Amino acid sequence: MTTLSIYHRPHITQPIQQLTAFNDIASLLASAGIQLEHWQAEAPPLNASSETILTQYHADIERLKQQEGYTSADVISLTPNHAERKALREKFLQEHTHSEDEVRFFVRGSGAFFVPIGEQVFQLTCEAGDLLRVPANTPHWFDCGEFPDFVAIRIFTNPEGWVGHFTGRETFH
């Protein structure tokens, strides 16, 4: 289930608000400039190639490309037995920005995006079918969990713009 928990810094042990209704979550995020959509997700076979997954969602990807000017897409897949899962998680957990929008569509599995907005931190747990667009230059971090198990499509304007610029600020998960 897609959920949004809102924390107030520095008291991050207990959320001050939790939402589970998708439309309420999308509306609140939109007020902060963050886009959340739900696409129909059909889990691909476990060993599906990136090409197979991109073909499966071609029409939706092309619609976004035309609407927003994105030019390319790829697939990221992390599993509990991925050789670099610990290092990747540590990297994702560092607050960073990108010089372009961060667009992710969860094909399978889930993960949590954290976006600090003023004195609050939004924790959005995305699941299969969720498309998230975090605007360019917005600080955020991502927790895929100790044993990540997700497949997501990443959509870019320029793959070089996806490179993270780390802020060095403290995060939590």
From Swiss-Prot:
UniProt-annotated binding residues for Fe(2+): 96, 98, 102, 140
Swiss-Prot/TrEMBL keywords: Amino-acid biosynthesis, Dioxygenase, Iron, Metal-binding, Methionine biosynthesis, Nickel, Oxidoreductase
EC category: oxidoreductase
Family: Belongs to the acireductone dioxygenase (ARD) family.
Function field: Catalyzes 2 different reactions between oxygen and the acireductone 1,2-dihydroxy-3-keto-5-methylthiopentene (DHK-MTPene) depending upon the metal bound in the active site. Fe-containing acireductone dioxygenase (Fe-ARD) produces formate and 2-keto-4-methylthiobutyrate (KMTB), the alpha-ketoacid precursor of methionine in the methionine recycle pathway. Ni-containing acireductone dioxygenase (Ni-ARD) produces methylthiopropionate, carbon monoxide and formate, and does not lie on the methionine recycle pathway.
One MF term in the entry's GO annotations: nickel cation binding
Site residues by UniProt (Important to generate the dianion): 104
Residues of the site described as May play a role in transmitting local conformational changes: 101
Quaternary state and interactors: Monomer.
UniProt-listed InterPro entries: ARD, ARD_bac, RmlC-like_jellyroll, RmlC_Cupin_sf
EC number: 1.13.11.54, 1.13.11.53
Cofactor binding comment, as recorded: Binds 1 Fe(2+) cation per monomer.
PANTHER family hit by this protein: ACIREDUCTONE DIOXYGENASE
Protein name (Swiss-Prot/TrEMBL): Acireductone dioxygenase 1
Gene3D superfamilies named among the record's database cross-references: Jelly Rolls (2.60.120.10)
Catalytic reactions on record: 1,2-dihydroxy-5-(methylsulfanyl)pent-1-en-3-one + O2 = 3-(methylsulfanyl)propanoate + CO + formate + 2 H(+); 1,2-dihydroxy-5-(methylsulfanyl)pent-1-en-3-one + O2 = 4-methylsulfanyl-2-oxobutanoate + formate + 2 H(+)
HAMAP family, A to Z: Salvage_MtnD
Binding site for Ni(2+): 96, 98, 102, 140
Organism encoding this protein: Pectobacterium atrosepticum (strain SCRI 1043 / ATCC BAA-672) (Erwinia carotovora subsp. atroseptica)
Cofactor requirement: Fe(2+); Ni(2+)
Site (May play a role in metal incorporation in vivo) location in chain: 95
Listed pathway(s): Amino-acid biosynthesis; L-methionine biosynthesis via salvage pathway; L-methionine from S-methyl-5-thio-alpha-D-ribose 1-phosphate: step 5/6
Example GO biological process: L-methionine salvage from methylthioadenosine
